[in-house]
Amino acid sequence: MPTQPVVRIGARGSKLSLTQSGIVQRRIAAALGVDPDNAAEVERVAPLIPITTTGDRVQDRRLLEIGGKGLFTKEIEEALMDGRIDCAVHSMKDMPAELPEGLCIAAIPEREDPRDAFISRGPERLEDLTEGAILGTASLRRQAQCLHRRPDLEAKLLRGNVETRLGKLEAGEYDAILLAYSGLRRLGLGHLPKSLIDPKEAPPAPGQGALAVETRAADRDLPWAQALRCRPTTLAVAAERGALIALEGSCRTPIGAHAWLEGGTCKLIVEALSPDGKLRFRHSGEAELSQMADPEASARDLGLSLGLAVKEEAGDAIVL
């Protein structure tokens, strides 16, 4: 009998990352012909390899102060390039606009709800917070979007895993916090938010709610990778990341992008703000993809076009 392939999966060591990686792990095992409910067999053919990243170790500063989004992926990508793992599972919103040479995003599974979640010790909505209330977030985008709507609020740094952030809210260090709803749902905490932020009013981070399965470029089209792909999610994320690339997005730039499909049409909203929320630059548009030879490239082109329009209008106003 031929030897069954083994796919080693690299992931950050946090509870959320391991939960998200576990979702992909079971999908890979199924693609390899293993019962996804047989935990021992799943671990045998698709073992999880936890890797601690610099972004996990440094918790007292914003990402932009210590190197940006790549700090959540660098060590994992090194393991991928060295051959210690065969794929890596990331939150798509943590992926930099440009990937290291020789690596690629081989699959994007079905997306979770991309909205931001508002969690507080009382008020139901951002608008209901008292004047001067303390809002916790480590995201420059969330900070800018909230200050645009509520300039009287005090935005305060909030780093750490989901459990740590919720604990700080409960301890009274913050009046409210904002988290990605997708992560809460995957952790079984989807009941905690008081409300959800309308993504057309305040677009989330490009790719929020989606997972990226990264491989070596030579492994892009292996059968197990193809089995993970979700076409609607791939097209929407292509549009959002097109905007990210056009805006040269990083943790120093408050950028939101929200794409969705209506039939064969991809619709996209892109916005960028000044870090203090006083200035907001927004463009929206759509592209018909159903007749295109390469729908993913066409979706990306839509994002590039709208992102460039925002960039030309905003200039240096959106960079911290």
UniProtKB/Swiss-Prot annotation:
Keywords: Porphyrin biosynthesis, Transferase. InterPro entries: HemC, Porphobilin_deaminase_cofac_BS, Porphobilin_deaminase_N, Porphobilinogen_deaminase_C, Porphobilinogen_deaminase_C_sf. Pathway: Porphyrin-containing compound metabolism; protoporphyrin-IX biosynthesis; coproporphyrinogen-III from 5-aminolevulinate: step 2/4. It is an enzyme of class 2 (transferase). GO terms for biological process: protoporphyrinogen IX biosynthetic process. Its cofactor is dipyrromethane. Binds 1 dipyrromethane group covalently. PROSITE patterns: PORPHOBILINOGEN_DEAM. It catalyses: 4 porphobilinogen + H2O = hydroxymethylbilane + 4 NH4(+). Its EC number is 2.5.1.61. The modification S-(dipyrrolylmethanemethyl)cysteine is found at residue 251. GO terms for cellular component: cytoplasm. Pfam families: Porphobil_deam, Porphobil_deamC. One of its GO terms (molecular function) is hydroxymethylbilane synthase activity. Tetrapolymerization of the monopyrrole PBG into the hydroxymethylbilane pre-uroporphyrinogen in several discrete steps. The porphobilinogen subunits are added to the dipyrromethane group. Monomer. Belongs to the HMBS family. This is Porphobilinogen deaminase.
